[in-house]
């Protein structure tokens, strides 16, 4: 659907086979973990690789596999507004919040907070965590530095992206969100443009038709729907998938 939307100059789909061999060798132990194909450690690598190969001022929209693009009139208008927000500002990042109740300190380890010198009583720790499944990046010196800082986290302590510290946390902690925790804190440190959750509409389906990016990948579907999707994959790929 992304290709048919006319929203993009280019649409790229990537998989494990597209990762650089040096990256694979460096993080082989983490990548062997089934969760997120290695705690989603690959995500920053593919975005950074794409960012390096576009012109300054160009914009990348990263979406997790399974996301759907809505091309209804109001959604198209909103999509253009996303780009205008970036192009009309000096900011290189546009991000979306998760659901309001999901606070940073509930889904980020103390060790990661300490790395960034962020206290649990700060506004960042008590703010809503940002999504890592839908992110806009405009190429600039600032956005390239963002990914250098991401790599520095991993070089300092690879366990900051894993579940290694899950038993050393305060009572409010629920679980580490791995790549999302790092992307979220860096997004706030870099003063991203932050919008409320405009991608997940499972509990407010009546609103989804006005927004362009739908993170429907986590929806529950029965066997009948899965069989339909397998049989008519080429057709469904050209249709917006709603919640």
Predicted regions and their residues:
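Glycosyltransferase catalytic domains, chiefly GT-A lineage
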Residues: 1-243
